[in-house]
Amino acid sequence: MIPKKIHYCWFSGEDYPESVLKCMDSWKRLLPGYELVLWDAGKARATGIPWVRGALERRRWAFASDAVRLYALESEGGIYLDTDVEVLKSFDGLLERDYFFGYENGSKRIEGAVMGAAPNSPAIAKALDFYKSHPFRYREDTVDDFVLPNILAQAFVDLPDLEIFPEHVFSPKSYIDGKIRLQPETLCVHHFASSWRAPCVQRGIARRQWLYAKFPRPVACCLAGILSVWMNFQNLGLAGTLKKACGMLGHSRKK
């Protein structure tokens, strides 16, 4: 059984922005009786995980939280939420499970922003092993190699019976056009703040969403593709752009 705990990470020590406060208010209103468990930088370092230590030293907060959320669920159990997740309905109906995961909007990858597990879950422990055995590394052109959804996919490859909820349950907001498509089963919205990406990538995401808001979808898709290639070339160079394109092609073939 999953305990009534909401784990979240905040490592910078800065005040919460208004968007985070809004999301946290939804947790308190709609999840009464749940304990909110903050994992700050000091508590994260105390895990002793090499990946966490390296990510904190480089102020890559989101990558530190990838490992910390797994550690929290494996050691204490509960539900992990990114601070840009807005809760719409109670999670009580999920607590009898050993774990729960959902798909990320539009990608068929496991959503890392919302997950839950009972303590000592073998599935969570298997994913956590990656972070325990690897030092932290980060380059924008290789980021897709070790983002949490891909680590989870690798860890769960031998768990064919793992149930994963459809994207509209936890991730109804489109990463592509920014639109939120709610359904009766939707429990929360991951707003994709993308604070972990480089500033140039964040600008590219904003421009792509602007294109989808201004043009018909086929036109926007074409223009967004051109924009993506141009942005990758500017930031990664020719070799990095080709490597990223090959990686995306390989991921597409695996689906």
Residue ranges and their predicted role:
Residues 1-65, 83-255:
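Glycosyltransferase-associated regions of secretory-pathway enzymes
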Residues 67-78:
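Small-residue hinge/turn detector
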